[in-house]
Amino acid sequence: MLQTSNYSLVLSLQFLLLCYDLFVNSFSELLRMAPVIQLVLFIIQDIAILFNIIIIFLMFFNTFVFQAGLVNLLFHKFKGTIILTSVYLALSISLHVWVMNVRWKDSSSFRWTNGLQTLFVFQRLAAVLYCYFYKRTAVRLGDPRFYQDSLWLRKEFMQVRR
């Protein structure tokens, strides 16, 4: 079971990774003159998103609901966050690769192709949704109902058995 002190630590780590993601999304364009620094920031951002995915799944595995065999219930409740986070990771990696390819040799020019602008807008839109849904999921996973046997869990288990 996830204890309060551990949950606070995990939640703080998740929010720290989200803040880093927000920081890179906000200020990475200011570093276009230093492509190596921008590349390092992008790599760390992608790793932070991947760590957030791993942390959410570890929190799933720690729940009583998961241990009782109701994996489908957890994934049904949180499938939006799982899908959105995966899409956001793919969009972020795509944007980072494209930006680095366009600007690596000539970082002093400010080139934006139509495709790059479109990808940029979708990645930033996905970033807003990712932050909202990820925070909501992280807080909802702190609900004690997920970590102990309860009437709610028994009802859900009976519905699955039917």
Curated annotation (Swiss-Prot):
The keyword Ubl conjugation does not apply. It is a multi-pass membrane protein. Glycans are attached at N6. Keywords: Cell projection, Cilium, Cilium biogenesis/degradation, Glycoprotein, Membrane, Transmembrane, Transmembrane helix, Vacuole. It is found in: Vacuole membrane; Cell projection, Cilium. One of its GO terms (cellular component) is vacuolar membrane. One of its GO terms (biological process) is cilium assembly. The chain crosses the membrane at residues 7-27, 41-61, 80-100, 115-134. Belongs to the TMEM138 family. PANTHER family: TRANSMEMBRANE PROTEIN 138. Required for ciliogenesis. This is Transmembrane protein 138. It comes from Rattus norvegicus (Rat). The gene is Tmem138.
